[in-house]
């Protein structure tokens, strides 16, 4: 038995080894060490703050004497000079430095607190009396830059200290502050300047030259003053500022190039700084913590000799992501071997991409020093990666469950019809607005022929102004039996929800169940008889049948719409229904009247009142059932404009629901974990469309910037292309595979459904963004009848898509023209622009197909 199992697992084991090796190799390729200029490990001096990762002067947590001694021993390997910032803290440093023959620039921190300033200066002068290894003094650190005090006050402090000091005295400010206040130079013995080109948006390759130029500018302005660079350096982490990019490689490059240049210039300088200081994040933002040659744990971040890898922790990340995925990869290769190599590879790539993305996100706290304040900022930076990872994992979960689960646990069928005297009374509500009367009459006529005894039909026409649309309904309803009722509301608020609430008020007092159908649905006679008996179980609040369509077979656009809709009802609805997290729909739905009225009826503030009601019912511990059998068929949207309008409304309504229900989705409610998961993540695919729109507009803008300002804007291909490729891969691979698995349709129909889905990307993105930024929406009825359009009306539905498409084409052409067709970077960038254009080409194709005869 063991041998038999081993033989079965060998192919999967080999596949997992090869795939993991390839994955690790890609990590190695992306993180190959970069050669930099080699310099001697000698530094003129270090700016020094001795706080460690869990320490901060802001809350009174200071390093011990032993920790300070350890720091000085590390710095002693590189220098004999250090610079301090305050005389009230870390008092052991100066005597510890003296034992190691190290000189100290002592500092007095000056800010808005005059009493504290006095204590700082007193402590500074006391140290000057006691320790001979203090060779310079700095009173104030960027106090003028922060506007903590006027220049006259600072000059007063400087004059006082100079009178009581036997060593040179200065204050530390950036170069431009010294140029702004020439009078300040008369009150110092030397100029203590900060030269930090990162803060000025200078690219790292020009940063050293820029530093020397600013130094020379000060020399020319004040030729008789000695200049000491008391801060010079580059951070290893932080936000991009103009062309300045913070990274360990850039930090190593700047320091090495500066040290090499200093061998010629012979400058008096202090590197900013010896050790990373996480506590500075609270004062200075991200970059403030990451200026050290050593990290907060006292490990050197880079060497001054040899090549430097872009990411020193890549081996750990690659190893963990490979190890975490290894056994699942082996099981994928074994479990899905009947798919063939293509299926196995597609699953493996998807799963490894998920694990790798999550591993990178998980390791970000190890790359950054987290505090409560900067946690939100850091989350913002990794939002793109985290969102992509979550979307991938959500799709992976749905894909795996639908593809491989032998049977659905919650699979309900038609119920056994009950005798007439045991039937629950049903009130069927049909709301319509400005609909073709013949279409609505067909729906009413189908309701007349239901195989059910105890029911009524309430038709509510709200806000239709054209009598030719609602008068025929009134006339036809007058010929119906007494259980058919018609109401015309000339002016009624609340859109469809308002009409349904009106119908609810008019409902027969004996009704136990409320049914809702759209105005275009022709219902089968067995709808009520086969589904209403489910309400005999008291916990059942909703019985939902799928949306289905008719009259779609003879036009390719309607075929596209039909199969695009079918995907959700054959796949997504089952996936959610398995955990009682159903998306309720506003047609072919049956609701327990008591539950509906207890919750206050339909929500008129939401333009997706059906889904919102379903979530409220779930929040009240009720069960929603899905019967995947067709009991009625409606019409597909008449054209692409109508399809876009419908999907835009759904996306907008989804955001209304999320915003309104977020406290219960995240806080205290009766929703279980699975229900919260589905409603919080179920629309993440649509969030991806919004993110893709942002990326696309950003790419166009970035292309323009690269063409207009090539010295300051480079090609961020990897940053932009990864999320786009992920979303496109999901749609291009998972969708067709699931369609082929769950539905009986041709590859052409799968292509059509995929084309429609991709073409709707912009409409969904607009709906998501508008839903997030606006509170109220407008319920636009989906047009189901086609009319002849003018040439402008043919273009109008996709004018935004065309504008973006033309912009992408022009951006790509301009980039190739400017950089040359043989430029590899330009080719990659234009390839990314081409990928980003696919949704807009699809929208153009959908519009053309929808208007064909």
Regions found by a protein language model. Give the residues of each.
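Aromatic-rich peripheral "rim/lid" segments of glycoside hydrolase catalytic domains that contact
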Residues: 40, 45, 51, 57-60, ...
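Short, acidic, metal-binding catalytic loop of nucleotide-sugar glycosyltransferases
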Residues: 444-454
């Amino acid at each position: 038995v063991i041998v038999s199992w081993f033989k079965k697992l060998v192919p999967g084991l080999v596949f997992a080894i090869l795939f993991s090796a390839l994955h690790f190799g890609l990590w190695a390729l992306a993180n190959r060490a970069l050669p930099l200029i080699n310099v001697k490990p000698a530094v003129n001096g270090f700016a020094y703050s001795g706080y460690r990762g869990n320490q901060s002067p802001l809350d009174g947590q200071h390093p011990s004497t032993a920790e300070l001694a350890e720091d000085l021993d590390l710095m002693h390997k590189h220098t004999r000079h250090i610079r301090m910032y305050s005389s009230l803290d870390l008092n052991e440093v100066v005597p510890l430095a003296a034992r190691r023959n190290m000189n100290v620039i002592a500092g007095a921190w000056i800010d808005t607190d005059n009493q504290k300033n006095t204590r700082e200066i007193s402590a500074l002068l006391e140290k000057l009396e006691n320790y001979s290894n203090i060779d310079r003094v700095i009173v104030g650190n960027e106090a003028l830059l922060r506007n903590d005090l006027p220049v006259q006050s600072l000059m007063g402090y400087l004059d006082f200290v100079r009178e009581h000091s036997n060593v040179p005295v200065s204050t530390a400010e950036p170069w431009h502050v010294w140029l702004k206040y020439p009078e300040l130079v008369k009150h110092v013995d030397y100029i203590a300047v900060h030269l930090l080109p990162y803060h000025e948006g200078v690219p790292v390759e020009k940063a050293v030259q820029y530093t020397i130029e600013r130094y020379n500018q000060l020399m020319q302005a004040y030729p008789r003053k000695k200049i000491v660079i008391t801060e010079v350096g580059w951070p290893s982490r932080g936000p991009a500022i103009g062309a300045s990019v913070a990274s360990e490689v850039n930090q190593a490059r700047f320091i090495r190039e500066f040290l090499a240049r200093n061998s010629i210039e012979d400058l008096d300088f202090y590197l900013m700084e010896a050790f990373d200081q996480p506590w500075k994040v609270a004062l200075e933002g991200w970059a403030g913590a990451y200026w050290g040659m050593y990290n907060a744990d006292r490990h050197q971040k880079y060497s001054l000799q040899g090549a430097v890898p872009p990411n020193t922790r890549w081996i750990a990340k690659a190893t963990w992501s490979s190890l975490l995925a290894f056994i699942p990869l082996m099981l994928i290769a074994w479990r899905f071997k009947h798919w063939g190599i293509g299926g196995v590879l597609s699953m493996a790539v998807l799963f490894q991409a998920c694990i790798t993305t999550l591993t990178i996100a998980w390791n970000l706290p190890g790359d950054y020093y987290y505090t409560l304040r900067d946690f939100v900022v850091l989350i913002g930076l990794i939002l793109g990666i985290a969102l992509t990872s979550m979307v991938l994992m959500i799709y992976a979960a749905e894909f795996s469950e639908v593809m491989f689960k032998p049977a659905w646990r919650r699979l309900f069928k038609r119920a056994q019809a009950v005798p007439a005297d045991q039937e629950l009374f049903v009130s069927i509500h049909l709301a319509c607005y400005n609909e073709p009367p013949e279409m609505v009459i067909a729906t009413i006529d189908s309701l007349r022929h239901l195989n059910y005894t105890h029911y009524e039909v309430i038709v509510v026409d709200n806000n239709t102004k054209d009598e030719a649309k609602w008068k025929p309904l009134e006339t036809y309803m007058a010929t119906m039996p007494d259980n058919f009722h018609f109401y015309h509301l000339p002016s009624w608020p609340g859109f469809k929800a308002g009409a349904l609430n009106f119908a609810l008020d008019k409902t027969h007092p004996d009704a136990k169940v409320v049914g809702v159908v759209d105005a275009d649905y022709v219902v089968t006679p067995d709808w009520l008889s086969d589904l209403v008996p489910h309400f005999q179980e008291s916990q059942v609040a909703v019985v939902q049948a799928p949306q289905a369509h008719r009259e779609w077979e003879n036009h390719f656009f309607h075929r596209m719409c039909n199969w695009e809709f079918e995907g959700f009802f054959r796949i997504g609805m089952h996936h959610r229904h398995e955990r009682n997290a159903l998306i309720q729909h506003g047609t072919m739905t049956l609701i327990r009247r008591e539950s509906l009225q207890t919750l206050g009826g339909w929500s008129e503030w939401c333009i997706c009142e059906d889904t919102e009601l379903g979530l409220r019912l779930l929040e009240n511990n009720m069960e929603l059932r899905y019967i995947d059998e067709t009991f009625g068929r409606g019409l597909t949207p008449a054209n692409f404009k109508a399809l876009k309008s419908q999907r835009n409304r759904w996306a907008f309504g989804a955001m209304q629901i999320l915003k309104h229900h977020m406290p219960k989705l995240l806080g205290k409610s009766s929703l279980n974990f699975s229900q919260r998961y589905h409603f919080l993540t179920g629309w993440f695919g649509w969030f991806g469309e919004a993110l893709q729109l942002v990326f696309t507009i950003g790419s166009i803008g970035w292309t323009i910037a690269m063409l207009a300002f090539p010295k300051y804007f480079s090609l961020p291909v990897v940053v932009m292309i990864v999320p786009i490729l992920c979303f496109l891969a999901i749609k291009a691979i998972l969708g067709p595979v699931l369609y082929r698995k769950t539905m009986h349709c041709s590859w052409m129909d799968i292509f059509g459904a995929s084309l429609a889905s991709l073409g709707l990307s912009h409409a969904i993105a607009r709906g998501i963004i508008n839903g997030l930024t606006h509170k109220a929406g407008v319920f636009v009825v989906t047009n189901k009848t086609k009319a002849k359009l003018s040439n402008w009306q043919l273009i109008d539905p996709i004018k935004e898509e065309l504008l973006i498409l033309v912009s992408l084409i022009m951006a790509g052409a301009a980039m190739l023209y400017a950089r040359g067709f043989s430029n590899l970077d330009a080719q990659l960038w234009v390839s990314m622009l081409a990928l980003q254009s696919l949704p807009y080409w699809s929208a153009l194709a959908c519009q053309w197909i929808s208007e064909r005869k």
